[in-house]
Amino acid sequence: RLFPEIWDFPLIQSAYNRIASIEKFLYPRSLKVLTKRQLEALESEVMSDALFMLEVEIAFAILMSAVLKDYFKLQPQSCFGYSVGETSMAFAQGIWGNFSEASKAFNSSKLFSSRLSDSKDAVREHWGLSKEQNLGEFWRNYLLMADVSQVKEAIKNEQRVYLTQINTPNEIVIAGEPAACERVINNIGCNAIPAPFNHVIHCEAMASESPE
């Protein structure tokens, strides 16, 4: 509502239909005020949907970039992105094409529905686990407040723990088998919390998906 002109910009037009669908899920409508429990359930549903989270970040990047570039006329001299930010940056700067078409490709692929999320078949195959076996929660991500060198040393003997992100020299994300990750945390003796997302990112266990 603050920047109505952006809806006429080509980049926004290319993404409008998908952004409209995302917005309805991100900001649910109700004739009654939702309870705290209902809101928490919706938040949990959103956080567990890796593809939806990816598309939300891309959509916001496109919208904010349109406001800054086309409304305020601020043109970047360079751009970079970290993790999903790299994908968001590429769409927001028009390096990659039509977001709505890309969204259709994302949603028709098994990459985010079963390969890296939900049943996590890529991990099962990498670890030699049966797809039919009910393993419960066999993958988890953790945020550690620890020195990166400590973490690298601590995971050397753990075959199912991966260092997935180095946010800062003292803020690290590891992922893998929960029991093995917790051994690493206990051995280091650092503060750590489970990450709010549970999909597979940035590690050897998803190497089979690189071609896609």
PLM regions with names:
Residues 1-28:
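Short, surface-exposed "cap/lid" segments of acyl-processing enzymes
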Residues 29-39:
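Short, glycine/acidic-rich hinge or "gate" loops at secondary-structure transitions
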Residues 38-212:
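Acyltransferase
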